Amino acid sequence: MSIKLEISFSKSAKLNGGLAILLKTAEADSAAGAETVDPAGVIVKAARIARYSAKSMNGLDIVVPEGAPVDRIVVIGLGKAAELTAHDWLKAGGAAASRIKNTDKAAVFIDVPGLTTSPRAAADFALGMLLRAYSFDTYKTKKGDEEEKPAKSVKVTIVTADPAGAKKAFSDSEAIAGGVNLARDLVNEPPNVLGPVEFAAKAKELEKLGVEVEILTEREMRRLGMGALLGVAQGSVRPPRLAVMQWKGGKGKDRPVAFIGKGVVFDTGGISIKPAAGMEDMKGDMGGAAAVTGLMHVLASRKAAVNAVGIIGLVENMPDGNAQRPGDIVTSMSGQTIEVINTDAEGRLVLCDALWYCNDRFKPQFMINLATLTGAIIVALGNVHAGLFSNDDQLSAQLTAAGLSSNEKLWRMPLGRDYDKLIDSKFADMKNTGGRQAGSITAAHFLKRFVQDTPWAHLDIAGTAMGSPQDEINQSWGSGFGVRLLDELVRAHYES
């Protein structure tokens, strides 16, 4: 289970056992808090013996002598002070959280000599701790020997010069951690537990935070003409849902910003069935919907001054006797017809109806959709960047900047008529795949046909939402990618 960190901020710490974590830059002669924790100079001696250099996120564990005010000391290196970024403070917090074992209290000293630590940096450090403390072991019945188990709850005191400022900044950090970890939970849940109905129920729980949530049933979607989404769902005994979440934190007359997520709770590929190897990972094919749900959690928790809409299309793609076939032609809510070439190109069929519904009903300032849409984007970008496709240069630039700020990086991909014509169909208005070439681009062009003139961006997060490389702030298979990115976008550009 995740370790619960009870984080507080103070100008000083009462030391009586437990763990002390001290930060140190490469240039500083001593670490933050050394005069309080280590009057005997053990740290300096240990660092000299170990040839410790305080490189970025490099740790040094020190067993303290009897009579010391703490049981254990850990020094975390920050690297060169001049090169520190906001993300480095997150990483430092994650590195610190990874060292919290078999203790129920920890004091963290972050005001390094010669370095001004802002309240925002202190809050980022704490956010890094919360993100790293997450784990998903709900279904493990054997969790190691008792002596190896970490404490379920750890009281963490972060010692800094401006505790009031840090506490104020941290209120947003707690909201962000809650949203990211909610998204991680949703992606990590097994598919027999989290179906479309169950996912919709999770979205409904956001009402406790003040989010207005509507759940559209299959009958309601059929009445609206969502033939593309329903075509994907017809092969499963589990009924589809469309969850519509609204956070009304802005002015009443302000048009909302809108986020749409692909929520294929399990994707076999349908009749165009996937290979068996790795199919278990397709429980994460709802990573876009998870990110949108996590984002709405953040916006509501921190009372964001914005009107926001989150819409998630929830289906299961299965190959039963009633499943959609290659060659079928379906009619989308827009009235445009689609020839189904490959039933494993199903996410775009879900999204096209959700996008049209969102645009038609809410007339948003922009629409951003997130989807684990194509394997082609992983071939192009790997697990480092998500693919960004957009019809609007300003929105694209804002997203790119938010990606750099949050370290949830995006790379803009091309669009153009030469790609768009690859999805023209002989028998319908379009087909749902253009073949192997430029697969992520033709998928984006398919979605573009359903947004009209509204500023729009498509984030293909197939390489970043699940199974991405673990790092200082994420040790989870489901990363929660997109939550911090989009919160940063809203915070920087769209709050009144």
Swiss-Prot record:
GO process terms (BP): proteolysis
Domain of life: Bacteria
UniProtKB keywords: Aminopeptidase, Cytoplasm, Hydrolase, Manganese, Metal-binding, Protease
Record CDD domains: Peptidase_M17
GO CC annotations on file: cytoplasm
Cofactor(s) essential for the protein: Mn(2+)
Known catalytic reactions: Release of an N-terminal amino acid, Xaa-|-Yaa-, in which Xaa is preferably Leu, but may be other amino acids including Pro although not Arg or Lys, and Yaa may be Pro. Amino acid amides and methyl esters are also readily hydrolyzed, but rates on arylamides are exceedingly low; Release of an N-terminal amino acid, preferentially leucine, but not glutamic or aspartic acids
Location in or out of the cell: Cytoplasm
The protein's role, per its UniProt record: Presumably involved in the processing and regular turnover of intracellular proteins. Catalyzes the removal of unsubstituted N-terminal amino acids from various peptides.
Listed name of the protein: Probable cytosol aminopeptidase
Species of provenance: Rhizobium johnstonii (strain DSM 114642 / LMG 32736 / 3841) (Rhizobium leguminosarum bv. viciae)
